Amino acid sequence: MQETLVSKAWPDAPRALDKARIAKTWQQYYEDRGYELWGFSPSPTARILARAILDGNPRRSERIEIVDYGCGYGRDSLYFIELGFDVIGIDLSETAVTLARGAYKQRQASGIPLLGSASFHAGDLHSVFKCRTGQRVRAFFSNRVLHLLSEIDLRDATRDAMTCMEEGAYFCVSARSPDDFNTALMEWIPGKEHEIARYKDPARSGHNITFVTKGSLLRVVGNDLEDMQYTKASEPERVGSPDTHLLILLGRKRGRGSDAATPMEGSNPAP
């Protein structure tokens, strides 16, 4: 899913039910709206990663492989492919993966030159890379997924990400920031004020938002990354919906023996 699952506020059994409920909701979104959910314009997060890679490899002398975690129907994956990157798209939604494969085939048949390649997989990082022992990628990318992971699940996901990344690889993710809290639509989880919100709409029951901050991201990945830069951005939650306010983190996996990273404010121009 473009956005995945889970709340850290509740124990495992209810959390599993919420995960299944949200997965079903996104399956329905993809079945009902398909490519009309976001269109195919690349996200601000994808543009930031692309610019960083291209600036660091101006001659394009090496192949760049990117994991697109929560790839949805492939809108950012296709953007990366057109730039010459190779993509491993991963999503929990089988419907989304089917759509991504279909969009890729349509683009191949359109006559538009594709300098890169892609494969799309239903599952998670662990299941996909279990059969890719020793494989390392040059970049890990995730747009608007991490705010729906519990603290434990977020740590698991980032640990798996670091495992599949080579030293110096780019880590570029976005998630909803506290600026996105909307009193008309959301309410705070008791005891988790200013951290976790839930939607008031009963149709979105269990669809909780764990807002990310620089501090929360630093706690999770600060020991693994260097050259960390944060950027604020916004984009519609879906076509025709209000904007969501995002915090974007761009960093690079620290090599062995590197000193501790110093987080920086920054933004990267889009290509």
Located regions from the model:
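Class I (Rossmann-like) S-adenosyl-L-methionine-dependent methyltransferase catalytic domain
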Residues: 2-64, 72-132, 149, 156, ...
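A short glycine-rich, Lys/Arg-flanked "PGG" loop and its adjoining helix->strand segment in the class I
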Residues: 155-167
